[in-house]
A protein has these predicted regions:
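PLP-dependent amino-acid enzyme catalytic core
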Residues: 1-483
Length: 483
C-alpha cells in the first residue's frame, strides 16, 4: 500500500507514517485507494471469501483486523501485525469483543468493551506494537490531544511500553468526571496527563504546531527523542478502526447484502475508518455523520462548505465538542482526485482548501468533490435536550443504556428516517454510558448505572497521580519538561 501526504504527495511506507504521525509538510498521510467496491467486484469477493459465514465468534475481530492490516499495512512484517492482534485480544476478555446487538430497529455496533469503555481501546491496544516496530529502538515521545476518550485509552495502551513516553493534553473543565479520573489516576512512570485551560481545538492546534516546528523537533532529537502522535492523525490509530466496519458487514452478511452506518463524529476519524472499510469492500451504502450542536461536520456533509465559525458550545457529549476536525483533510484529498489516482491534483486542491481555512476561516469543495461527498455521506445534528430525550426513549423502548454520544447518533438516525428500504442501520456505539454518570442522572432523574464495568467503581478511590494544569501557551514548555 502506498501512502502519500495530503499536501504535497510526499510518499512514505506505512511504518514511516506510524512513526512520524504528521507529514513533514503539515499534511496527513493517506493510503492511495480506489473507489473499488461494487457487488461482485474482485475486492468484494475477497472480503466475502475471508468472512466465513459472517458469524466469526471469538475470532471475528481478530480476523477483521488481519484482513485490514494485510491490505493497509502490508509492508509491516506479518509477525508484527500478528503481535498487534494478539495484544489486542489479550486486553479484551469478552467472548465477543465487538458484538452487534439489535435494539429498537437499530444494529448497535458495541465498541466500548475495552478497559476504558470507549471505541479507541481497540486501536490503542495495537498502536504501541506498530510504534515500537517503526521506531527501531529509538525513543518516542507521543503527544496527544484529547476531548476525553483518546487520552485514557492512549495512556492505558502505552503504559509500561519500553522506549515510549506519552503525554495527553485534555480540557481541564471540558470532560466528564470519569473521563478525567481515567486520565489523572494512572501512576505509570511513562504516562502523563496535563489539563489545559482551553478546549480540544486549542490542544490539537498546539500539538500539530509542535509536530510542524523544525526547531522543536530538533530540540527533541538532541535529547534522542522523536515526536509522534496517538491521535487519529496517526495511521497506526486510524487503520485498526477500519476493522470495526469490516466486521459489521460480516456479521450482517446473512441478513442483508448492504447496511447503512451512523457514527457520532468529532475529529472525523471513526467515520473515515468506515469510509476506508467501504473502499476495501465492506458493503456500506450510506455513511451518516452525527453531530451535536457543534455541528460543523453535519453542515459540511450537507453543503460541501467547511465553516467552523466562532461558536463553540460545551455539551453533554464532550468528545464531540470540536470545531476543527483533522481527519476531514483526508476526505478532502480523496474526493478531490485522490480516489481517481490524480495525486498531484488532489494535493493541490487539499493544500488550497487548508490554506483557505487558515486565512479565511472556511473553504468550499469543488463541484465534482461535492458530488462524491454527497454520494456517500449524509449528516444530521442533535441538541443536548434531544440527546437526553433519546437516552430515555431507548431505555424505555428497549431497556438499553446509551451514552450521550451514541444517543446523538441514534437521534440523528431516527430524524433522518433510518433504517430505510429494509437495509439494516448500524449505529456505532462508541462509549459506555458509565463514563457519563452526570448526564445519565440528569437524563433519568435517578441512578440507572447499577452494574459498572470492571475498573470503574474504584476510580474515585484511587490517588490522583497526574496533577499538572497549564495555559494553552504553556503546552510547549510542558512537552520540553519530558525531554
Amino acid at each position: 500500500m502506498k501512502y502519500v501526504s495530503t499536501r504535497n504527495g510526499l510518499a512514505a511506507t506505512s511504518a514511516e507514517t506510524v512513526f512520524r504521525g504528521l507529514a513533514p509538510d503539515g499534511g496527513l498521510y493517506v493510503p492511495v485507494l480506489e473507489k473499488a467496491w461494487e457487488p461482485g467486484s474482485a475486492v468484494a469477493k475477497a472480503m466475502a471469501d475471508e468472512s466465513g459465514n459472517g458469524e466469526r465468534g471469538t475470532g471475528g475481530l481478530a480476523d477483521a483486523e488481519r484482513f485490514v492490516l494485510s491490505r493497509l499495512f502490508d509492508d509491516i512484517p506479518e509477525s508484527v501485525r500478528e503481535a498487534a492482534v494478539e495484544r489486542l485480544l489479550s486486553r479484551f476478555p469478552a467472548e465477543d469483543p465487538v458484538p452487534v446487538v439489535t435494539r429498537d430497529d437499530f444494529e448497535m455496533l458495541e465498541l466500548f468493551h475495552g478497559k476504558t469503555g470507549a471505541f479507541k481501546d481497540v486501536a490503542l491496544s495495537m498502536l504501541p506494537v506498530f510504534m515500537k516496530h517503526a521506531a527501531g529502538g529509538r525513543r518516542v515521545l507521543v503527544l496527544t490531544a484529547t476531548s476525553g476518550d483518546t487520552g485514557s485509552a492512549a495512556m492505558q495502551g502505552f503504559a509500561g511500553v519500553d522506549g515510549t513516553e506519552i503525554v495527553v493534553f485534555y480540557p481541564a473543565t471540558g470532560t466528564s468526571k470519569i473521563q478525567r479520573l481515567q486520565m489523572t489516576t494512572p501512576p505509570d512512570a511513562n504516562v502523563h496527563a496535563v489539563g489545559i485551560r482551553g478546549n480540544f481545538d486549542d490542544a490539537q492546534a498546539a500539538v500539530k504546531r509542535i509536530f510542524a516546528d523544525p526547531a522543536m523537533n530538533a530540540e527533541a532529537a538532541s535529547h534522542g527523542i522523536t515526536l509522534s502522535s496517538a491521535n487519529s492523525i496517526n495511521t497506526g490509530r486510524l487503520v485498526p478502526q477500519v476493522a470495526y466496519y469490516v466486521l459489521a458487514g460480516w456479521k450482517l452478511a446473512s441478513r442483508s447484502p448492504q447496511f447503512d452506518v451512523v457514527v457520532p463524529s468529532g475529529n472525523f476519524g471513526n467515520i473515515l475508518a468506515a469510509y476506508y472499510a467501504k473502499l476495501l469492500g465492506s458493503p456500506i451504502r450510506k455513511l451518516v455523520v452525527a453531530s451535536n450542536v457543534n455541528d460543523v461536520l453535519a453542515r459540511f456533509t450537507k453543503t460541501g462548505v467547511y465553516d467552523p465559525g466562532d461558536r463553540f458550545t460545551v455539551t453533554n457529549s464532550p468528545s464531540m465538542d470540536i470545531r476543527k476536525s483533522s481527519n476531514v483533510e483526508r476526505l478532502l484529498w480523496m474526493v478531490s482526485g485522490g480516489l481517481g489516482g490524480d495525486i498531484a491534483g488532489a494535493c493541490a486542491e487539499t493544500a488550497r482548501m487548508m490554506g483557505e481555512l487558515e486565512r479565511l476561516g472556511r473553504y468550499e469543495l469543488s463541484a465534482k468533490a461535492k458530488e462524491l461527498l454527497f454520494e456517500d455521506f449524509e449528516g444530521g445534528e442533535a441538541t443536548p435536550e434531544e440527546t437526553e430525550a433519546e437516552m430515555r426513549r431507548m431505555h424505555d423502548a428497549a431497556g438499553y443504556l446509551l451514552d450521550p454520544h451514541t444517543a446523538v447518533a441514534s437521534c440523528v438516525a431516527r430524524k433522518l428516517g433510518y433504517p430505510k428500504d429494509g437495509v439494516p442501520c448500524v449505529i456505532a456505539a462508541t462509549a459506555t454510558a458509565y463514563k457519563f454518570p452526570e448526564t445519565c442522572m440528569r437524563a433519568f432523574g435517578e441512578d440507572v448505572l447499577t452494574d459498572p464495568p470492571p475498573g470503574f467503581a474504584e476510580l474515585e478511590s484511587l490517588p490522583i497521580a497526574q496533577k499538572k494544569v497549564c495555559d494553552v501557551n504553556e503546552i510547549d514548555d510542558a512537552v520540553r519538561e519530558l525531554f
